Design a protein with these regions (language model features):
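Conserved catalytic alpha/beta cores of large enzymes that bind or transform nucleotide phosphates
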Residues: 129-219, 223-225
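Conserved phosphate/anionic-ligand binding catalytic regions in large, soluble enzymes, centered on
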Residues: 37-68, 107-150, 217-240
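N-terminal beta-alpha lobe that positions the nucleotide/phosphoryl donor
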Residues: 1-103, 202-205, 217-219, 226
């Protein structure tokens, strides 16, 4: 199997000394006891007409696995999994333009919630809002197993002048993993997330010189851990 052999070559290849030193310094910069997660982030994900969701592999780097480059090379090698190759072929994506980046962040064990959010009102684009998908624990949002359904929430800027809250929420769909009438995200978590989404949107609008572009939006991934700490894991421009 040529692909399997190629992946093995990538995993076994020694890292250049300067890169190895920088990766080790990055690893050591995490607080003591932190288990890092090496997350795939390819340049051919979330393209127009091609999401690439779930094609590539991410790895948790455990304390007994030595240099973090071991796990990073595993992520790089996943660019050449058979399924990924076939998907790129089908969508006519040039393999020679494909590249794999790795996002390293603390691993989240015992997650209470995971989710993705868009800094855009996808139902009424001319009206400010945020579209949020969330699910209990580590259950997948983008590629759910079986018949699981994620929570879908639209958060809108309120037009009720007498409302004590700046936003109102519309539950488009309820999670199949919570009791009837329950929610995945608490109201406090939801409002905290919206505040962070506002900051992310404003930052990247300036960063990409898109402050005057009403179509610009960010695709954001978040987690709520066992201590109820909400953390942003990843943010990138949304491609329609």
């Amino acid at each position: 199997d040529l692909l399997k052999a190629f992946r093995r070559t990538i995993k076994d290849a020694p890292l250049p000394a300067p890169l190895s030193a920088k990766l080790d310094a990055m690893h050591q910069s995490f607080p003591s006891g932190t288990t890092p997660r090496c997350r795939s982030s390819a340049n051919n994900e979330d393209l127009v007409g091609f999401t690439g969701a779930g094609l590539y592999d991410s790895y948790t780097h455990r304390a007994d696995e030595g240099h973090i480059g071991t796990s990073i090379k595993q992520v790089w090698a996943s660019l050449w999994d058979l399924r990924a190759l076939n998907e790129r072929d089908f969508y006519r994506i040039d393999h020679m333009t494909a590249a794999m980046g790795v996002l390293v962040h603390p691993n989240f064990d015992d997650e209470l919630v995971n989710g993705v959010a868009l800094t855009r009102n996808i139902y009424y684009p001319d009206f400010e809002g945020y579209f949020i998908n969330a699910q209990i624990g580590e259950n997948l949002v983008t590629n759910p197993d079986g018949a699981e359904i994620a929570e879908e929430v639209l958060v809108l800027q309120t037009i009720n002048e007498n409302s004590p809250y700046p936003y109102e929420t519309i539950y488009v769909r309820r999670s199949s993993l919570v009791p009837d009438g329950g929610t995945v995200l608490s109201h406090i978590d939801l409002m905290t997330l919206v505040s962070l989404l506002q900051r992310i949107q404003g930052h990247f609008q300036q960063r990409y010189d898109r402050a005057d572009d009403p179509s610009f939006a960010m695709d954001v991934e978040f987690k709520v851990d066992s201590n109820r700490q909400l953390t942003i894991k990843q943010a990138r421009p949304w491609l329609r």
